[in-house]
């Protein structure tokens, strides 16, 4: 099966954009790792948000075929992990698009979670919610992601999360905020209720439905079982998992975290050895930082070819120029450490985002997963299938890659 060149190009463009400040504060990571254990268990998580959690409507706008309600509420995340969210993200904001007429006595609602870069409501309202009003008389509730739109920190550039911990905060917050909105919709007499999302939004919707204590229709589009992208079983990957599970409470034992944080500040895009020794030496001073989904999907094949090239030419370098060989050996060691650090991060990300680490939805037969056949942005090779994790769910495939499907095939998602 081929892969989309557009996806590969987009993935490369994402590099150096996200997680520019590294992992985040060690004390924040410790609290988030502990909190993940709570929301990974539906029996515990369902009691975190009460059925009467307060939700407020700020404005109602009448249109020809629908009403648009704007509302807000305090993110439950702020209660359970205080001061972990930026002040701009504490207030959760949403838009509720309701048809003026229903097709039956039921009032169905679908909650749409935002994909990467989907700020505010325009895209989901225009491409999903308004057509669903016309086609099915179905209401849509659009929740704004933490770190996006009105909830974006002032010092954040566009969608570029500054820390790895920000992604974990976003995921935990969306799980609890979705629960608050589902409770509110039930109180208001709406139903049946369902959830969907595209790309990152689909993954977040999957985590939210996993924690809802009732059967819930779910349509995750262009997402898969984990945010880590490429599944690996190396020691560094396992170390990343164990790091989360047994994160120490002692600050003086965080050397591994600090080491990886420093290592991730190496330039992962500089994978070609300069012919000038001075350039080899100075390359260690370059700075990029690990990146979000782009980093998680970083192909390690180039690194392997790089190491193979060094190994093949070892004797030639040694005999002709011992000093150059010494510098290249240092570069090779640095690249090896860089590679291990990236794999370590994938282990941490997998432990925190893999749906297998969350409860199985109450009724997986209500889940339809939509995938692109040529998706090179979220590859499925080597990753546990959602059909294996959620027995009974249905997988549907559409032609094309991740980006082309996201841009041009949203009608199929509806």
Curated annotation (Swiss-Prot):
UniProt KW keywords: Glycoprotein, Secreted, Signal
Signal peptide, first to last residue: 1-24
Glycosylation sites: 282, 307
SUPFAM superfamilies noted in UniProt: alpha/beta-Hydrolases
Protein species of origin: Homo sapiens
Lineage of the species this protein comes from: Eukaryota, Metazoa, Chordata, Craniata, Vertebrata
Domain of life: Eukaryota
Protein family according to the UniProt entry: Belongs to the AB hydrolase superfamily.
PANTHER family according to UniProt: PROTEIN ABHD18
Main location: secreted
Localisation: Secreted
Name of this chain's protein: Protein ABHD18
Pfam families documented for this protein: ABHD18
GO terms for cellular component: extracellular region; mitochondrion
């Amino acid at each position: 099966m081929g892969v989309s060149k557009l996806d590969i190009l987009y993935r490369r463009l994402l590099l150096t954009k996200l997680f520019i400040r590294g992992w985040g504060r060690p004390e924040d990571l410790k609290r988030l790792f502990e909190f993940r254990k709570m929301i990974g268990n539906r029996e515990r998580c369902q009691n975190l948000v009460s059925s009467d959690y307060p939700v407020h409507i700020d404005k109602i706008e009448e249109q020809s075929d629908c009403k648009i309600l704007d509302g807000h509420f305090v993110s439950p995340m702020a209660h359970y992990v205080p001061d972990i969210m930026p002040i701009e993200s504490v207030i959760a904001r949403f838009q509720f698009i309701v048809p003026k007429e229903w097709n039956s006595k039921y009032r169905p609602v679908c909650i749409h979670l935002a994909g990467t870069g989907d700020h505010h409501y325009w895209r989901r309202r225009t491409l999903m919610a308004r057509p669903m009003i016309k086609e099915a008389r179905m209401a849509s509730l659009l929740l704004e992601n933490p770190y996006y739109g009105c909830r974006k920190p002032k010092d954040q550039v566009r969608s570029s999360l500054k820390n790895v911990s920000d992604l974990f905060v976003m995921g935990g917050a969306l799980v609890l905020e979705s629960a608050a909105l589902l409770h509110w919709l039930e109180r208001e007499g709406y139903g049946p209720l369902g959830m969907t999302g595209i790309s990152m939004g689909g993954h977040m919707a999957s985590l939210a439905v996993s924690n809802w204590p009732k059967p819930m229709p779910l349509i995750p589009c262009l997402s898969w079982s984990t945010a880590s992208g490429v599944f690996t079983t190396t020691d560094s990957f396992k170390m990343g998992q164990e790091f989360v599970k047994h994160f120490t409470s002692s600050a003086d034992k965080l050397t591994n975290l600090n080491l990886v944080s420093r290592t991730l500040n190496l330039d992962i895009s500089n994978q070609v050895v300069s012919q000038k020794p001075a350039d080899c030496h100075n390359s260690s001073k370059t700075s990029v930082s690990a990146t979000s989904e782009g980093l998680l999907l970083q192909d390690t094949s180039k690194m392997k070819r790089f190491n193979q090239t060094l190994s093949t030419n070892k004797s030639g370098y040694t005999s002709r120029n011992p000093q150059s060989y010494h510098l290249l050996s240092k570069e090779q060691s640095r690249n090896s450490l860089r590679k291990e650090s990236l794999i370590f991060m994938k282990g941490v990300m997998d432990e925190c985002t893999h749906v297998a680490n969350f409860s199985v939805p109450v009724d997986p037969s209500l889940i339809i997963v939509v995938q692109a056949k040529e998706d090179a942005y979220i590859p499925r090779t080597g990753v546990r299938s959602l059909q294996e994790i959620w027995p009974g769910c249905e997988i549907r495939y559409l032609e094309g890659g991740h980006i082309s499907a996201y841009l041009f095939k949203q009608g199929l998602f509806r």
